[in-house]
Amino acid sequence: MSQLLHLHRLSLPQSSLRFRFPPLHRRRAASSPTNSTQPPLQFRPLTVSRSQITCRFSQSDITPQFELDKAKDNRKPQKRANGIFWIILINLGIYLADHFFQVRGIKSLYLYHNFPAWYQFVTATFCHANWNHLSSNLFFLYIFGKLVEEEEGNFGLWLSYLFTGVGANLVSWLVLPRNAVSVGASGAVFGLFAISVLVKMSWDWRKILEVLILGQFVIERVMEAAQASAGLSGTIYGGYSLQTVNHIAHLSGALVGVVLVWLLSKFPSASMDQDVKKSS
């Protein structure tokens, strides 16, 4: 039995039963650098300068968004037409106060050619003889007034309406007899028509054809409305006769509108100045 144990010990040497590792201090010495003067390792937070950061995008990823932003910037902001509705409401209010409620002193807003007050040249553009006269003027006032306001803004609309209306009344006062009375926005309507045509006009045969057809329609309708107000042609207010058709006001209103556009074209617009500054 002792011989068997002795043989077993000989067949299984001690070196085969153990896993030998180098000592810990030797492993550290082997892994550490030979230069003992090198400072120990220090852990620093990860920092990257901005100049080292580069982002790469493909053109297909960035171009569509750029084009969308550019289209939004170039899109013309839409202007809400509010001034024309205020002008229409003022005309309606004065008509109701004159013909329905018969407010005392409302007829002092008419333009009496014999001895006119300075404000009557303005207020007469908001007065009308009857409903046919008012409804026809308001129809074309809305169409052409909205066109002018979309291009020139609220202030431009009021300036055009008052300038052409006052100009038409002034020419009528100079030409018509002294016992005449002038009311109506027909002069301002023709003035707004001329301004809208000149502002939006482009030298295209389609646009010219539209202007000719629409201009003839406007003239006919306004003349019919003026003829429809013939019921007041013989009405006398303290020795004054209300004129039926004021052709002078119609033509002078359109002429004043042309003059207004010509005068405004002499002044550079704010948008042109901004474009020049941006380009420089």
Swiss-Prot record:
- EC number, as in UniProt: 3.4.21.-
Name where it mostly resides. plastid
Show which residues sit on the Stromal side of the membrane. 58-82, 141-154, 200-243
How this chain sits in the membrane, per its record, is: Multi-pass membrane protein
Q: One of this protein's Pfam families, by short name? A: Rhomboid
Role, per record: Rhomboid-type serine protease that catalyzes intramembrane proteolysis. May be involved in TIC22 processing during its import.
Protein's name in the database: Rhomboid-like protein 11, chloroplastic
Organism (species): Arabidopsis thaliana (Mouse-ear cress)
